[in-house]
């Protein structure tokens, strides 16, 4: 069926009448948004049926992408764009008496992720669909998801984010496809005619109800699915207890089941929190694998060819239990031998690593497994025993055996489980993958070198250029056509316009318009007035010490002190924009947020800074905010300690929108530098190798005593600002350490270099032609960071599936 403005109008009116019992004149903005979503969902559902039939008929290998996060953002505009119906939908909404912009703004961000991990998964699902790869994403249908951030008295406060209130229009519940998950209990085993018989009894049951969210590809009828699992208790309320007035007790089991899918990353600094997190991970993995294997048996009648028709990509270690759970299904349910099951598993599962931080490599206490997952624990023990024997036979080195162990000294190491049970392990940037091979997983790489790969991250360039920055999209189309939407490498054709004054002038005008648009948004959303004549200098990302928001703050303090010393100095206006959420239990990160707000209050209220220096903390940073901010940004701060950031994807989105990078040679910045050169970005700081060498004899206090600028800046932390809050704890942490080495992320070591690079940024900005030319080169050379390229790499080197070229 062909859809146009009129057919969409009629379909929307029908949805309003049938689902809300109202006319278009009576409908609220929320009802209109949901009606539009339902219309697009119906179009995708029809195409999805056709996609699944083709996949089954042609017996194609299917990719299953498991991630505890999918940061989808808003879907109404995105799906309309991919279906190539955005103009028609916008017109239909307008003719029904609504402003399309208001309707799009009504949609909440889907609260299914926290940061880069979840946004990457969302971009990849889009590209898998656009490239017509049969695929499905799997996660948990979090009721509240990641928290909504509120800044109260300068401090982060976490509020529940009830995104499902309006976001459920995209979900298609499938209760008939529910799976049952077992926790606790005990396991009995016996041998019967050479077969191990396993009986799991006295367990607690939880139902996993699938809620499917359809994903449309661009310029294709192919539709894939994101399956989200909702946890429910199969037991009805205990009416006897309820009638006795024991209301909480009567609901106890239901509440425990519901808690599994309530919130993303519950705090785990206590036993109950750890237990809930492990329950979440097994719930999600077990439901997913039961669903996948059930569908496979329906199609092929056996699991012996499972690995030939399925590949399971796990996004970080959160879904690592897919390895023992697949073994359980193959052995206990399908009756295969251990060796048969292990061969299938080892050819089905691939693992993407996202961190080199030792503290972020996931591990669990053994007793949790023994209590919550007794059968999985038995299988884990056997995996660990066999893997340890393999390592012993290869290295004959007890230290290497300990380092590579799946289970050691009462602790389960999930990354080692992924290495032992997976067919491939990949990093997400060239530098990151090199560090994994040379350092983090050096011994495993020495034993199985062919298992280790690199697939540099990418982002959905259709969303992060064309959809969110229509002015830039128009310029690109006028210069090189629209072929870049499906072949991002064609953006390189823009390089030939670097000497075209009209193109550069138009690019500058687009950036100025986007700054004005973001300023209006910020005024409306946060009541802050931005100086649009200033450089928009932006750092937005999860708050973590290694990402070094604090280094940015130290530099801003130094600028403020310069203005205090000489209010009449020649000063290029700068507006520093921060956006970041801190994990609820991460006290240091929360202190840094408070420091940013203290500094903002001081600077923004000081007359000497007016129209010169401004600091703004953007509350509740999220995908929809990024979509407004990135087109308006001029400087992208990517300043993590070299060797600590796996890749980053925000750096790529800023690059695509023409912001210039101020950064270290870390993560994907290294590959950005390879295509841009020194002349099109602003590098500073130690390299990863230099940082590693410095740590052996690092004395931050020596830098403090020798550098008067740094000395004065750090002393300001102790003194604090006009709100009377002292940050001596951060001062002490940098100079003397606390629960960590002093200045473990080398802020002070890179401070002088960072300040010098920041000065180069300001000097270069004054030359508008040069700046605009650099901006154009950034856009032109960003095509390599398209998620389409990343997915093609996965398809070619790990999944071995065909895709649309």
Question: Over which residues does each language-model region extend?
Answer:
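A conserved ligand/cofactor-binding region detector
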Residues: 1-805
């Amino acid at each position: 069926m062909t859809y146009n403005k009129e057919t969409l109008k009629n379909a929307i009116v029908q949805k309003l009448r049938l689902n809300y019992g109202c006319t278009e004149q009576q409908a609220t903005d929320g009802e209109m948004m949901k009606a539009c979503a339902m219309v697009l969902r119906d179009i995708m559902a029809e195409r999805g049926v056709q996609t699944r039939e083709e996949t089954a008929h042609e017996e194609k290998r299917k990719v299953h992408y498991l991630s505890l996060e999918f940061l989808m953002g808003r879907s109404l505009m995105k799906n309309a764009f991919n279906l190539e119906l955005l103009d028609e939908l916008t017109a239909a909404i307008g003719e029904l008496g609504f402003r399309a912009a208001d309707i799009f703004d009504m949609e909440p961000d889907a609260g299914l992720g926290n940061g880069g991990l979840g946004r990457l998964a969302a971009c990849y699902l889009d590209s898998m669909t656009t490239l017509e790869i049969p695929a499905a994403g799997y996660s948990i249908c979090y009721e509240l998801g990641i928290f909504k951030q509120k800044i109260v008295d300068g401090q982060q406060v976490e509020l529940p984010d009830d995104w499902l209130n309006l976001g459920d229009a995209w979900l298609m519940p499938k209760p008939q496809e529910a799976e049952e998950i077992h926790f606790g209990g005990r396991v009995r085993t016996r041998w019967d005619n050479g077969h191990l018989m396993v009986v799991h009894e006295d367990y607690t049951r939880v139902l996993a109800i699938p809620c499917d969210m359809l994903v449309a590809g661009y310029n294709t009828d192919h539709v894939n699915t994101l399956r989200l699992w909702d946890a429910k208790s199969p037991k009805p309320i205990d009416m006897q207890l309820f009638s006795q007035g024991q209301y909480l007790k009567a609901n106890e089991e239901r509440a425990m089941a519901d808690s599994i899918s309530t919130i993303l990353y519950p705090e785990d600094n206590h036993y109950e929190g750890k237990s809930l997190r492990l329950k979440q991970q097994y719930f999600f993995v077990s439901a997913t694998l039961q669903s996948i294997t059930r569908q496979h048996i329906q199609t092929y009648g056996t699991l012996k060819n499972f690995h030939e028709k399925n590949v399971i990509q796990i996004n970080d270690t959160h879904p690592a239990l897919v390895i023992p759970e697949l073994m359980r299904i193959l052995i206990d349910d399908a009756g295969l031998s251990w060796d048969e099951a292990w061969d299938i598993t080892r050819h089905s599962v691939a693992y993407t690593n996202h961190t080199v931080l030792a503290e972020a490599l996931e591990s669990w206490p053994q007793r949790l497994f023994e209590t919550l997952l007794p059968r999985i624990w038995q299988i884990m023990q056997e995996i660990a025993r066999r893997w340890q024997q393999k390592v012993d036979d290869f290295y004959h080195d007890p230290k290497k055996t300990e380092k590579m162990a799946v289970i050691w000294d009462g602790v389960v190491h999930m990354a080692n489980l992924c290495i032992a049970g997976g067919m491939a392990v990949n990093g997400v940037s060239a530098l990151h993958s090199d560090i994994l091979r040379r350092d983090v997983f050096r011994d495993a790489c020495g034993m199985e070198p062919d298992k280790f790969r690199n697939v540099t991250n990418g982002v959905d360039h259709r969303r992060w250029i064309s959809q969110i920055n229509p002015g830039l999209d128009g310029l690109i189309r006028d210069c090189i056509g629209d072929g870049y939407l499906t072949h991002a490498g064609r953006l390189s054709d823009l390089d030939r316009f670097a000497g075209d004054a009209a193109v550069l002038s138009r690019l500058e005008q687009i950036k100025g318009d986007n700054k004005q648009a973001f300023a209006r948004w910020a005024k409306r959303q946060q009541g802050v007035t931005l100086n649009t004549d200033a450089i928009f200098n932006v750092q937005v990302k999860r708050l973590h010490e290694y990402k070094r928001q604090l280094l940015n703050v130290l530099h801003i303090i130094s600028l403020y002190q310069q203005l205090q010393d000489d209010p009449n100095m020649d000063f290029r206006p700068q507006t520093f924009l921060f956006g970041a959420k801190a994990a609820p239990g991460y006290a240091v990160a929360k202190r840094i947020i408070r420091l940013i707000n203290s500094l903002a209050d001081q600077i923004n209220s000081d007359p000497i800074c007016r129209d010169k220096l401004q600091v703004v903390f953007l509350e509740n940073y999220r995908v929809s905010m990024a979509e407004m901010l990135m087109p308006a940004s001029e400087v992208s701060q990517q300043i993590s300690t070299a060797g600590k950031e796996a890749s980053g994807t925000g750096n790529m989105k800023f690059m695509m929108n023409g912001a210039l990078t101020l950064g270290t040679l870390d993560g994907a910045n290294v590959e950005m530098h390879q295509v841009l050169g020194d002349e099109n970005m602003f590098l500073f700081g130690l390299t990863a190798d230099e940082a590693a060498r410095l740590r052996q004899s690092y004395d931050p206090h020596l830098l403090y005593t020798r550098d008067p600028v740094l000395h004065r800046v750090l002393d300001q932390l102790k003194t604090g600002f006009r709100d009377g809050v002292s940050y001596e704890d951060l001062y002490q942490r940098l100079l003397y350490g606390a629960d960590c080495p002093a200045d473990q992320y080398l802020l002070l070591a890179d401070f002088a270099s960072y300040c010098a690079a920041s000065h180069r940024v300001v000097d270069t900005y004054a030359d508008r032609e040069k700046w605009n030319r650099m901006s154009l080169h950034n856009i032109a050379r960003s095509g390599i960071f398209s998620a389409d390229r990343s997915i093609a790499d996965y398809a070619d080197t790990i999944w071995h599936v065909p895709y649309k070229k």
